[in-house]
């Protein structure tokens, strides 16, 4: 159901030391705009959370895609520009200050949530952003003249931090949306043009459905974003078209597409790893995608020629192999790991000696206990020594009354029986 939030609680106390009920805490709040789980996300669609703040006739907008680490801001003095941006973005959640008058003007948008006014405080927001990015000021992000947008960004950052209950290391930069570089399409025109959604809200018979020949989820989402935000600059448009034409005419075009079809959704996998919510198969997909990079890089180098478009040369330069990480994952992760880590069988044998020993104990506990009993008998010289188990004490070592006095000082007496 849209708009529902779910709190996840986990046991954080130790039952062995807790007096009374074991301590439990909320470790995550899942909301529509802060999803990162693969099963809850549409691979072809962005999942966005936005915040809007109004002050002195200026409107500040902040946009975050938690599942990829994208973080953007916009400031405008025109309400229609703000509405056009929100219509383009289609956020799953829209954060507004409590009792804000602007709520009446934005009631057409879904997912509105009211947040405390202090979360939009400019000074607090500035500090939160500087702490997040590890900088002394925000001038490097070209946002110094966007104070109202910074207020909105501070609210989004606080909200996402509150719901995820952890640091957000994959948020590494703040980007300024420059709508003067793109064509602004009003909500009505956008709906009637059926760029990415048809009039019924589906994707069939849209411009995107006709043009989308992408091979990766990341490419599909990027294409949709480009279609909803058309460029104004003819030079940049020609640069994109020239890059596409060069690739299409190159002999490596089809092999390149075949390789990309094998790639995982790296953008979202990396975000889940940063948020410590990745599952074993995320690591397997990352491993398999990294394994493609050497060949992918080799193919791209054949495209780098003096007359190639600069955009293509930049892309080729960024397609680099990561041998250290690829080798680490290849040695560590099983070929086909389970869906969830609690099922075991994630780490390959031979990767970690201590883990191998623990797995051996887990898989053959009876043999381990016999071995332990034999070793302890030999070490202590106590022939009556036995290893046993009960529900009260768990595993224990039992000695006869005669030999109990000879027990090593490292043994701790738990109970005295009739003859032991």
Locate predicted features.
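Active-site proximal loops enriched in glycine and acidic residues that flank catalytic Cys/His/Asp
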Residues: 98, 389, 401
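Divalent-cation-assisted or electrostatically stabilized phosphate/pyrophosphate-binding catalytic cores
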Residues: 410-420
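Charged catalytic and DNA/RNA-contacting regions of genome-maintenance
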Residues: 1-249, 254, 261-274, 278-374
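Cytochrome P450 core scaffold surrounding the K-helix E-X-X-R motif
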Residues: 401-410
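Flexible, glycine/threonine-enriched loop-and-boundary segments that flank and lead into catalytic domains
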Residues: 367-387
